[in-house]
Curated annotation (Swiss-Prot):
Intracellular or extracellular location(s): Secreted
Pfam family, one: Toxin_12
Keyword Disulfide bond recorded: yes
Protein name per Swiss-Prot or TrEMBL: U7-theraphotoxin-Hhn1f
GO cellular component labels: extracellular region
Proregion span(s): 20-50
InterPro entries recorded: Huwentoxin-1
Function in brief: Ion channel inhibitor.
């Protein structure tokens, strides 16, 4: 009986250690992913864009790309660029 209880306690201790290690690894991966997203976001902000892309917010001073048109779509409260059913010429 003592052996069975000792085995159960030992198994619980092993599971606790493994789950703690897994949680620490998961947190490190989450931090790396967040840093990667911030780097990509910063890189895309530095690019100069001449037009707004699909589902991008548009106004007179922010035109859509050639194959898109600026439309008001409910329930969105601002104008967005939507496809005008044409394809861009290459």
């Amino acid at each position: 009986m003592k052996t069975a209880i000792f085995t159960v306690v030992l198994a619980l201790a092993v599971f606790a250690v493994l789950s703690f290690g897994w949680e620490a690894n998961e947190k490190a991966l989450s931090e790396e992913f967040t840093e990667l997203i911030h780097e990509k976001e910063a890189a895309s902000e530095t690019e100069a864009r001449g037009c707004r892309y699909f589902w991008g917010e548009c106004h007179d001073h922010m035109p859509c790309c050639d194959w898109l048109v600026c439309r008001y779509k409910w329930p969105i409260t601002y104008n967005i660029c939507v496809w005008n059913r044409t394809f861009p010429e290459k």
